[in-house]
Amino acid sequence: MSGSKRLVLIDQAVVSGTGFLITVVLVRALGLGVFGTFALIELGALFALSLQQSRLGQPLLTFAPKQPDAQRPSYFAAALRLELWFTLVLAVLVAGTYGVYLDHWDAPATLGTWIPVTLTIVSRQLFAYLRAECFATGRVRRALCLDLLAYPTALVVLTVIWSRGELTLARTFWVLGGAASIACLAALPGVAGRGVKPQSLRETGAKHWGFARWLAGMSVAQFFASNSFLVAAAALLGAPAAGAIKAAQRVMGVLHLGFQAMENVVPVSAARLLAAEGMTRFRSYLTRILTLGFLATALISAGIAIFARFVLDLVYEGVVDDRMVLGLRAMAVLYVASFTITVLQIGFRTLETTRVVFAAYMANTFVAVVSAQPVVERFGYAGAVWGMAAQQGLMAALLLFEWRRAGLTSARSSSA
Protein backbone atom coordinates (compact mmCIF):
# COMPACT_ATOMS: atom_id res chain seq x y z
CA MET A 1 0.00 0.00 0.00
CA SER A 2 1.37 3.42 -0.98
CA GLY A 3 2.05 6.10 1.59
CA SER A 4 -0.79 8.33 0.37
CA LYS A 5 -3.35 5.52 0.51
CA ARG A 6 -2.16 4.63 4.00
CA LEU A 7 -2.67 8.23 5.07
CA VAL A 8 -6.18 8.19 3.56
CA LEU A 9 -7.07 5.16 5.67
CA ILE A 10 -5.62 6.80 8.78
CA ASP A 11 -7.58 9.95 8.04
CA GLN A 12 -10.83 8.05 7.60
CA ALA A 13 -10.14 6.16 10.82
CA VAL A 14 -9.85 9.51 12.59
CA VAL A 15 -13.10 10.82 11.08
CA SER A 16 -15.14 7.65 11.53
CA GLY A 17 -13.66 6.80 14.92
CA THR A 18 -14.23 10.20 16.48
CA GLY A 19 -17.70 10.45 14.93
CA PHE A 20 -18.58 7.12 16.50
CA LEU A 21 -17.16 8.12 19.90
CA ILE A 22 -19.03 11.43 19.80
CA THR A 23 -22.24 9.45 19.31
CA VAL A 24 -21.38 7.27 22.31
CA VAL A 25 -20.87 10.38 24.45
CA LEU A 26 -24.12 11.97 23.28
CA VAL A 27 -26.26 8.86 23.77
CA ARG A 28 -24.90 8.31 27.28
CA ALA A 29 -25.03 11.98 28.25
CA LEU A 30 -28.31 13.08 26.65
CA GLY A 31 -30.33 9.84 26.56
CA LEU A 32 -32.12 8.40 23.55
CA GLY A 33 -34.85 11.05 23.61
CA VAL A 34 -32.63 14.14 23.34
CA PHE A 35 -30.20 12.25 21.11
CA GLY A 36 -33.15 11.55 18.82
CA THR A 37 -33.78 15.30 18.66
CA PHE A 38 -30.09 15.82 17.85
CA ALA A 39 -30.37 13.23 15.07
CA LEU A 40 -33.37 14.99 13.54
CA ILE A 41 -31.57 18.35 13.55
CA GLU A 42 -28.51 16.67 12.08
CA LEU A 43 -30.61 15.67 9.08
CA GLY A 44 -30.56 19.32 8.06
CA ALA A 45 -26.77 19.34 8.18
CA LEU A 46 -26.62 16.17 6.10
CA PHE A 47 -29.02 17.66 3.55
CA ALA A 48 -26.89 20.79 3.16
CA LEU A 49 -23.75 18.69 2.91
CA SER A 50 -25.27 16.45 0.23
CA LEU A 51 -26.17 19.50 -1.88
CA GLN A 52 -22.66 20.91 -1.47
CA GLN A 53 -21.08 17.59 -2.40
CA SER A 54 -23.20 17.21 -5.53
CA ARG A 55 -22.72 20.81 -6.74
CA LEU A 56 -19.08 21.35 -5.74
CA GLY A 57 -17.29 18.51 -3.94
CA GLN A 58 -17.94 15.67 -6.38
CA PRO A 59 -17.39 17.79 -9.53
CA LEU A 60 -14.11 18.97 -7.99
CA LEU A 61 -12.84 15.42 -7.48
CA THR A 62 -13.92 14.48 -11.01
CA PHE A 63 -12.78 17.54 -13.00
CA ALA A 64 -9.59 18.52 -11.17
CA PRO A 65 -7.54 15.49 -12.33
CA LYS A 66 -8.66 16.12 -15.92
CA GLN A 67 -7.51 19.76 -15.98
CA PRO A 68 -4.31 20.59 -17.91
CA ASP A 69 -1.54 21.56 -15.51
CA ALA A 70 -1.52 25.16 -16.69
CA GLN A 71 -5.26 25.60 -16.12
CA ARG A 72 -5.60 23.73 -12.84
CA PRO A 73 -4.84 26.69 -10.47
CA SER A 74 -7.41 28.93 -12.15
CA TYR A 75 -9.96 26.11 -12.01
CA PHE A 76 -9.44 25.74 -8.25
CA ALA A 77 -9.74 29.51 -7.86
CA ALA A 78 -13.11 29.49 -9.61
CA ALA A 79 -14.33 26.48 -7.63
CA LEU A 80 -13.34 28.20 -4.36
CA ARG A 81 -15.34 31.31 -5.22
CA LEU A 82 -18.37 29.23 -6.11
CA GLU A 83 -18.07 27.48 -2.74
CA LEU A 84 -17.89 30.79 -0.86
CA TRP A 85 -21.04 32.01 -2.63
CA PHE A 86 -22.76 28.74 -1.76
CA THR A 87 -21.71 29.17 1.89
CA LEU A 88 -23.16 32.68 2.06
CA VAL A 89 -26.50 31.65 0.56
CA LEU A 90 -26.67 28.59 2.80
CA ALA A 91 -26.05 30.67 5.95
CA VAL A 92 -29.02 32.91 5.15
CA LEU A 93 -31.31 29.99 4.30
CA VAL A 94 -30.40 27.92 7.35
CA ALA A 95 -30.74 30.81 9.80
CA GLY A 96 -34.17 31.73 8.43
CA THR A 97 -35.52 28.20 8.04
CA TYR A 98 -34.36 26.88 11.40
CA GLY A 99 -35.58 30.03 13.16
CA VAL A 100 -39.09 29.51 11.78
CA TYR A 101 -38.89 25.81 12.64
CA LEU A 102 -38.01 26.56 16.27
CA ASP A 103 -41.08 28.75 16.61
CA HIS A 104 -43.27 25.72 15.87
CA TRP A 105 -41.24 22.96 17.58
CA ASP A 106 -42.33 22.30 21.15
CA ALA A 107 -39.11 20.69 22.36
CA PRO A 108 -37.45 22.18 25.49
CA ALA A 109 -34.11 20.61 24.56
CA THR A 110 -33.85 22.89 21.51
CA LEU A 111 -33.73 26.11 23.56
CA GLY A 112 -30.69 28.18 22.66
CA THR A 113 -29.80 26.14 19.57
CA TRP A 114 -30.56 28.65 16.79
CA ILE A 115 -27.08 30.18 16.46
CA PRO A 116 -25.00 27.03 17.17
CA VAL A 117 -27.06 24.88 14.78
CA THR A 118 -26.67 27.45 12.01
CA LEU A 119 -22.94 27.68 12.72
CA THR A 120 -22.56 23.89 12.67
CA ILE A 121 -24.39 23.33 9.38
CA VAL A 122 -22.61 26.16 7.53
CA SER A 123 -19.11 25.49 8.85
CA ARG A 124 -19.31 21.74 8.28
CA GLN A 125 -20.20 22.06 4.61
CA LEU A 126 -17.41 24.61 4.06
CA PHE A 127 -14.97 22.29 5.79
CA ALA A 128 -16.15 19.42 3.56
CA TYR A 129 -15.16 21.45 0.48
CA LEU A 130 -11.76 22.41 1.91
CA ARG A 131 -11.17 18.77 2.78
CA ALA A 132 -12.15 17.58 -0.70
CA GLU A 133 -9.77 20.15 -2.19
CA CYS A 134 -6.92 18.54 -0.23
CA PHE A 135 -7.66 15.15 -1.77
CA ALA A 136 -8.12 16.63 -5.25
CA THR A 137 -4.64 18.18 -5.03
CA GLY A 138 -3.02 15.11 -3.49
CA ARG A 139 -2.37 16.81 -0.13
CA VAL A 140 -3.57 13.94 2.01
CA ARG A 141 -1.33 14.83 4.95
CA ARG A 142 -2.88 18.29 5.06
CA ALA A 143 -6.38 16.75 5.09
CA LEU A 144 -5.35 14.53 8.00
CA CYS A 145 -4.05 17.51 9.99
CA LEU A 146 -7.29 19.43 9.40
CA ASP A 147 -9.40 16.45 10.43
CA LEU A 148 -7.34 16.05 13.60
CA LEU A 149 -8.14 19.66 14.38
CA ALA A 150 -11.86 19.36 13.65
CA TYR A 151 -12.94 15.99 15.03
CA PRO A 152 -10.81 14.88 18.02
CA THR A 153 -10.94 18.44 19.36
CA ALA A 154 -14.74 18.31 19.44
CA LEU A 155 -14.66 14.86 21.06
CA VAL A 156 -12.32 15.98 23.85
CA VAL A 157 -14.35 19.10 24.65
CA LEU A 158 -17.66 17.21 24.62
CA THR A 159 -16.21 14.54 26.91
CA VAL A 160 -14.98 17.15 29.39
CA ILE A 161 -18.37 18.89 29.50
CA TRP A 162 -20.12 15.51 29.90
CA SER A 163 -17.82 14.55 32.78
CA ARG A 164 -18.93 17.72 34.56
CA GLY A 165 -22.61 16.87 33.97
CA GLU A 166 -23.19 20.04 31.95
CA LEU A 167 -23.69 18.74 28.40
CA THR A 168 -26.84 20.02 26.69
CA LEU A 169 -28.03 20.01 23.09
CA ALA A 170 -27.10 23.67 22.61
CA ARG A 171 -23.60 23.15 24.00
CA THR A 172 -23.18 20.11 21.76
CA PHE A 173 -23.79 22.19 18.65
CA TRP A 174 -21.58 25.02 19.93
CA VAL A 175 -18.71 22.56 20.26
CA LEU A 176 -19.29 20.87 16.88
CA GLY A 177 -19.72 24.15 15.03
CA GLY A 178 -16.80 25.79 16.80
CA ALA A 179 -14.40 22.95 16.01
CA ALA A 180 -15.41 22.94 12.33
CA SER A 181 -15.02 26.73 12.15
CA ILE A 182 -11.52 26.59 13.64
CA ALA A 183 -10.54 23.93 11.10
CA CYS A 184 -11.89 26.11 8.26
CA LEU A 185 -9.87 29.11 9.44
CA ALA A 186 -6.76 26.94 9.57
CA ALA A 187 -7.40 25.61 6.05
CA LEU A 188 -8.22 28.81 4.17
CA PRO A 189 -4.70 30.35 3.99
CA GLY A 190 -3.31 27.37 2.07
CA VAL A 191 -6.32 26.49 -0.06
CA ALA A 192 -5.67 25.82 -3.75
CA GLY A 193 -6.60 28.73 -6.00
CA ARG A 194 -6.17 31.43 -3.37
CA GLY A 195 -4.61 34.53 -4.91
CA VAL A 196 -4.96 33.16 -8.45
CA LYS A 197 -7.09 34.72 -11.18
CA PRO A 198 -10.04 32.34 -11.58
CA GLN A 199 -11.53 30.91 -14.71
CA SER A 200 -14.85 32.40 -15.71
CA LEU A 201 -17.24 31.72 -12.85
CA ARG A 202 -20.07 31.47 -15.33
CA GLU A 203 -18.28 28.84 -17.41
CA THR A 204 -17.08 26.87 -14.39
CA GLY A 205 -20.50 27.05 -12.78
CA ALA A 206 -22.14 25.93 -16.02
CA LYS A 207 -19.69 23.03 -16.28
CA HIS A 208 -20.40 21.99 -12.70
CA TRP A 209 -24.13 22.35 -13.27
CA GLY A 210 -23.99 20.28 -16.44
CA PHE A 211 -22.30 17.57 -14.44
CA ALA A 212 -24.25 18.00 -11.22
CA ARG A 213 -27.78 18.89 -12.31
CA TRP A 214 -28.77 15.27 -11.94
CA LEU A 215 -26.61 14.83 -8.84
CA ALA A 216 -28.31 17.78 -7.14
CA GLY A 217 -31.72 16.30 -7.82
CA MET A 218 -30.34 12.96 -6.74
CA SER A 219 -29.17 14.49 -3.45
CA VAL A 220 -32.69 15.69 -2.71
CA ALA A 221 -34.11 12.32 -3.71
CA GLN A 222 -31.47 10.49 -1.67
CA PHE A 223 -32.23 12.59 1.39
CA PHE A 224 -35.93 11.77 1.33
CA ALA A 225 -35.36 8.13 0.39
CA SER A 226 -32.80 7.57 3.15
CA ASN A 227 -34.68 9.40 5.87
CA SER A 228 -38.39 8.82 5.18
CA PHE A 229 -38.55 5.85 7.54
CA LEU A 230 -36.52 7.67 10.21
CA VAL A 231 -38.82 10.70 10.09
CA ALA A 232 -41.89 8.45 10.10
CA ALA A 233 -40.53 6.66 13.18
CA ALA A 234 -39.92 9.97 14.95
CA ALA A 235 -43.38 11.29 14.06
CA LEU A 236 -45.31 8.12 14.93
CA LEU A 237 -43.17 6.54 17.65
CA GLY A 238 -41.38 9.56 19.16
CA ALA A 239 -37.85 10.98 19.26
CA PRO A 240 -36.49 8.04 21.34
CA ALA A 241 -37.28 5.70 18.42
CA ALA A 242 -35.29 7.95 16.08
CA GLY A 243 -32.50 8.01 18.65
CA ALA A 244 -32.42 4.21 18.83
CA ILE A 245 -32.19 3.96 15.04
CA LYS A 246 -29.38 6.50 14.76
CA ALA A 247 -27.48 4.97 17.68
CA ALA A 248 -27.60 1.59 15.94
CA GLN A 249 -26.58 3.18 12.65
CA ARG A 250 -23.50 4.75 14.21
CA VAL A 251 -22.24 1.40 15.45
CA MET A 252 -21.93 0.43 11.79
CA GLY A 253 -19.62 3.42 11.41
CA VAL A 254 -16.69 1.01 11.29
CA LEU A 255 -17.67 0.41 7.67
CA HIS A 256 -17.57 4.14 6.94
CA LEU A 257 -13.81 3.89 7.07
CA GLY A 258 -13.81 2.03 3.78
CA PHE A 259 -16.75 3.93 2.29
CA GLN A 260 -15.31 7.38 2.88
CA ALA A 261 -11.84 6.32 1.81
CA MET A 262 -13.35 5.16 -1.47
CA GLU A 263 -15.09 8.50 -1.98
CA ASN A 264 -11.77 10.30 -1.62
CA VAL A 265 -9.53 7.93 -3.59
CA VAL A 266 -11.55 5.90 -6.09
CA PRO A 267 -13.13 8.80 -8.08
CA VAL A 268 -9.69 10.31 -8.77
CA SER A 269 -8.12 6.94 -9.66
CA ALA A 270 -11.10 5.95 -11.82
CA ALA A 271 -11.05 9.25 -13.72
CA ARG A 272 -7.32 8.92 -14.40
CA LEU A 273 -7.69 5.31 -15.59
CA LEU A 274 -10.57 6.22 -17.89
CA ALA A 275 -8.64 9.12 -19.40
CA ALA A 276 -5.31 7.29 -19.74
CA GLU A 277 -6.21 3.64 -20.43
CA GLY A 278 -9.81 3.64 -21.63
CA MET A 279 -13.12 2.02 -20.79
CA THR A 280 -11.94 -1.60 -20.46
CA ARG A 281 -9.35 -0.81 -17.78
CA PHE A 282 -11.80 1.49 -15.99
CA ARG A 283 -14.52 -1.18 -15.84
CA SER A 284 -12.06 -3.82 -14.65
CA TYR A 285 -10.91 -1.52 -11.83
CA LEU A 286 -14.46 -0.78 -10.61
CA THR A 287 -15.52 -4.43 -10.88
CA ARG A 288 -12.59 -5.56 -8.73
CA ILE A 289 -13.36 -2.98 -6.06
CA LEU A 290 -17.06 -3.88 -6.10
CA THR A 291 -16.46 -7.63 -5.77
CA LEU A 292 -13.77 -7.60 -3.08
CA GLY A 293 -15.37 -4.79 -1.12
CA PHE A 294 -18.78 -6.44 -1.18
CA LEU A 295 -17.39 -9.66 0.27
CA ALA A 296 -15.52 -7.81 3.02
CA THR A 297 -18.55 -5.66 3.90
CA ALA A 298 -20.85 -8.69 4.01
CA LEU A 299 -18.47 -10.56 6.31
CA ILE A 300 -18.14 -7.68 8.77
CA SER A 301 -21.89 -6.99 8.72
CA ALA A 302 -22.71 -10.64 9.39
CA GLY A 303 -20.45 -10.68 12.43
CA ILE A 304 -22.03 -7.52 13.83
CA ALA A 305 -25.56 -8.83 13.24
CA ILE A 306 -24.85 -12.15 14.98
CA PHE A 307 -23.33 -10.50 18.06
CA ALA A 308 -25.56 -7.40 18.00
CA ARG A 309 -26.45 -7.25 21.70
CA PHE A 310 -22.89 -7.94 22.80
CA VAL A 311 -21.60 -5.15 20.55
CA LEU A 312 -24.22 -2.69 21.77
CA ASP A 313 -23.57 -3.48 25.44
CA LEU A 314 -19.89 -2.72 24.89
CA VAL A 315 -20.71 0.63 23.34
CA TYR A 316 -23.85 1.94 25.07
CA GLU A 317 -23.72 0.20 28.44
CA GLY A 318 -26.81 0.99 30.46
CA VAL A 319 -29.08 2.25 27.65
CA VAL A 320 -29.37 -0.80 25.35
CA ASP A 321 -32.85 -2.19 24.66
CA ASP A 322 -34.42 -4.64 22.20
CA ARG A 323 -35.13 -1.83 19.72
CA MET A 324 -31.44 -1.04 19.39
CA VAL A 325 -30.57 -4.73 18.88
CA LEU A 326 -33.15 -5.09 16.11
CA GLY A 327 -32.01 -1.80 14.60
CA LEU A 328 -28.37 -2.87 14.51
CA ARG A 329 -29.23 -6.11 12.71
CA ALA A 330 -31.22 -4.22 10.10
CA MET A 331 -28.43 -1.67 9.69
CA ALA A 332 -25.95 -4.50 9.10
CA VAL A 333 -28.01 -5.59 6.09
CA LEU A 334 -28.43 -1.98 4.98
CA TYR A 335 -24.69 -1.33 4.88
CA VAL A 336 -24.03 -4.22 2.49
CA ALA A 337 -26.39 -2.53 0.03
CA SER A 338 -24.85 0.87 0.79
CA PHE A 339 -21.41 -0.35 -0.25
CA THR A 340 -22.76 -1.47 -3.62
CA ILE A 341 -24.48 1.88 -4.12
CA THR A 342 -21.31 3.82 -3.26
CA VAL A 343 -19.15 2.01 -5.82
CA LEU A 344 -21.71 2.15 -8.62
CA GLN A 345 -22.35 5.86 -8.06
CA ILE A 346 -18.63 6.53 -8.40
CA GLY A 347 -18.66 4.65 -11.70
CA PHE A 348 -21.60 6.58 -13.13
CA ARG A 349 -20.16 9.91 -11.97
CA THR A 350 -16.82 9.15 -13.63
CA LEU A 351 -18.61 8.35 -16.89
CA GLU A 352 -20.57 11.60 -16.40
CA THR A 353 -23.86 9.70 -16.83
CA THR A 354 -25.46 10.92 -13.64
CA ARG A 355 -28.94 10.94 -15.18
CA VAL A 356 -29.06 7.17 -14.63
CA VAL A 357 -28.36 7.59 -10.92
CA PHE A 358 -30.95 10.36 -10.68
CA ALA A 359 -33.64 8.20 -12.30
CA ALA A 360 -32.87 5.32 -9.94
CA TYR A 361 -33.05 7.62 -6.93
CA MET A 362 -36.34 9.11 -8.06
CA ALA A 363 -37.91 5.66 -8.37
CA ASN A 364 -36.49 4.62 -5.01
CA THR A 365 -37.58 7.85 -3.35
CA PHE A 366 -41.14 7.44 -4.58
CA VAL A 367 -41.32 3.97 -3.05
CA ALA A 368 -39.80 5.13 0.26
CA VAL A 369 -41.94 8.26 0.67
CA VAL A 370 -45.17 6.48 -0.22
CA SER A 371 -44.53 3.40 1.91
CA ALA A 372 -42.81 4.83 5.02
CA GLN A 373 -45.84 6.01 6.98
CA PRO A 374 -48.12 2.99 6.34
CA VAL A 375 -45.29 0.52 6.98
CA VAL A 376 -44.36 2.16 10.30
CA GLU A 377 -48.02 2.43 11.30
CA ARG A 378 -48.54 -1.28 10.56
CA PHE A 379 -45.28 -2.78 11.81
CA GLY A 380 -43.98 -0.14 14.23
CA TYR A 381 -40.26 0.08 14.94
CA ALA A 382 -39.50 -3.15 13.06
CA GLY A 383 -41.17 -1.72 9.97
CA ALA A 384 -38.99 1.40 10.22
CA VAL A 385 -35.62 -0.35 10.44
CA TRP A 386 -36.31 -3.15 7.97
CA GLY A 387 -37.97 -0.65 5.64
CA MET A 388 -34.72 1.33 5.62
CA ALA A 389 -32.75 -1.82 4.77
CA ALA A 390 -35.18 -2.82 2.01
CA GLN A 391 -35.07 0.67 0.52
CA GLN A 392 -31.27 0.54 0.23
CA GLY A 393 -31.48 -2.94 -1.26
CA LEU A 394 -33.88 -1.69 -3.92
CA MET A 395 -31.55 1.17 -4.79
CA ALA A 396 -28.56 -1.16 -5.11
CA ALA A 397 -30.54 -3.48 -7.38
CA LEU A 398 -31.63 -0.61 -9.66
CA LEU A 399 -28.09 0.74 -10.02
CA LEU A 400 -26.61 -2.71 -10.59
CA PHE A 401 -29.14 -3.35 -13.36
CA GLU A 402 -28.23 -0.06 -15.06
CA TRP A 403 -24.50 -0.69 -14.60
CA ARG A 404 -24.76 -4.03 -16.36
CA ARG A 405 -26.67 -2.42 -19.20
CA ALA A 406 -23.97 0.24 -19.51
CA GLY A 407 -21.27 -2.44 -19.42
CA LEU A 408 -22.86 -4.39 -22.26
CA THR A 409 -23.22 -1.26 -24.34
CA SER A 410 -19.58 -0.32 -23.76
CA ALA A 411 -18.37 -3.79 -24.66
CA ARG A 412 -20.29 -3.79 -27.91
CA SER A 413 -19.20 -0.31 -28.88
CA SER A 414 -15.55 -1.03 -28.14
CA SER A 415 -15.60 -4.20 -30.23
CA ALA A 416 -17.25 -2.53 -33.20
Language-model regions, residue ranges each:
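Interhelical loop/hinge segments that connect adjacent transmembrane helices in multipass membrane
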Residues: M1, R141, C145, G165-V175, ...
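Hydrophobic alpha-helical transmembrane segments
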Residues: L111-T118, L144-R194, A363-V367, Y381-R405
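Transmembrane helix-bundle signature of multi-pass secondary active exporters and lipid flippases
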Residues: E42-S50, M218, Q222, S226, ...
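Membrane-water interface segments that mark the loop-to-transmembrane alpha-helix transition
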Residues: L7-G19, I41, S50-G99, P108, ...
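Helix-loop junctions and terminal segments of transmembrane helices
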Residues: Q52-D69, A136, A248, M252-E277, ...
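Signature of the first transmembrane helix
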Residues: S2-G57, R213-P240, V369, Q373, ...
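Membrane-interface junctions at transmembrane-helix termini in multi-pass inner-membrane proteins
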Residues: S2, S123-C145, V333-A360
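Interfacial segments at transmembrane-helix termini and the short loops linking adjacent helices
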Residues: V100-P116, I306-V336
